[in-house]
Amino acid sequence: MHRTNEPRPPASRLRIGSAPDSWGVWFPDDPHQVGWDRFLDEVAEAGYTWIELGPYGYLPTDPARLRDETARRGLSVSAGTVFTGLHRGEAVWEETWAHVAKVAELTREAGAGYLVAIPAFWRDDKTGEVLEDRELTPAAWRDLSRLTERLAHRVREEYGLRTVVHPHADTHVDTEEHVVRLLDTTDPDLVELCLDTGHYAYCGGDSVRLIETYGRRLGYLHLKQVDPEVLARVRAQDLPFGPAVAQGVMCEPPLGVPALEPVLAAARPLGVDLFAIVEQDMYPCPPDRPLPVARRTRALLESYLDG
């Protein structure tokens, strides 16, 4: 019997932000990308107050300078990002940890609380060269789950950060089957989910259903959409992710899928503070394109939250 006087869990406090990705930034240094100072100026001008670090080395890596550059623009950092290949087992652990520790230290010094961990690509995201089998063996899945837990535990103990795993196109954690498998084989107290709505839709997943089923594992959101027509061409041609992005597979909301208002509505009742970071993959893109898109997207998301 339902008791009407039972207290309801508080609604999640959704903190909207953006990231270098939405300015066409994929690499620490690339002639096709805008400079880091322009990114910081424009993300603040677009009305965001939260950002991610993006690829290590794009923003200043000196903690004092990074804090100064972000603070004087009214910006705060929510997370850093690492790519990992933990399915390869113990042989890659030390090398992986050396990279993770470097990023985690800067992330902590920037005042952020999250480390976004993206699994390694099975094919090169620029050239399409196949690097590994598309499917992991049972042994590789065991290594992935076990070492992801070890990574999350060590990151928490040494840097005080929460690790959120980011399913990503052209990695071994992409489809609903693979995402659920990782969640079901890892400790929920250690390993949380960074749900990227665009990547999940790209790989055939339903973000709302995932939130409704695994909401207690949701630690972080990346908001983006895919263009269904472009995605159909990408799938028909089996294009790698990089060329797909160059063709515009990730599009400006609300022009694609999934609809973001139901995603936010599904996340709000979870009763946790949650970052919702806009990440519209646009590499490469004209330098004057990101700012107007960022303004419109922020206004759209704010309208969903105010509604």
Give the positions of each predicted feature:
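N-terminal pre-domain/capping segments
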Residues: 2-112, 138, 142, 149-150, ...
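Active-site acidic/histidine proton-transfer and metal-coordination neighborhood
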Residues: 2-8, 92-193, 289
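Non-cysteine beta-strand/loop elements that form the S-adenosyl-L-methionine
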Residues: 17-19, 78-80, 115-120, 216-227, ...
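Acidic/histidine-rich catalytic cores of soluble enzymes
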Residues: 18, 50-51, 145-257, 306
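Acidic-and-aromatic substrate-binding clefts and catalytic sites of carbohydrate-active enzymes
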Residues: 27-32, 50-65, 85-96, 169-175, ...
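Short, flexible, mixed-charge acidic loops at enzyme active sites
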Residues: 30-34, 121-129, 230-243
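A short, acidic, amphipathic alpha-helical segment used as a generic capping/interface helix at domain edges
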Residues: 254-270
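C-terminal/domain-terminus segments
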Residues: 274-304
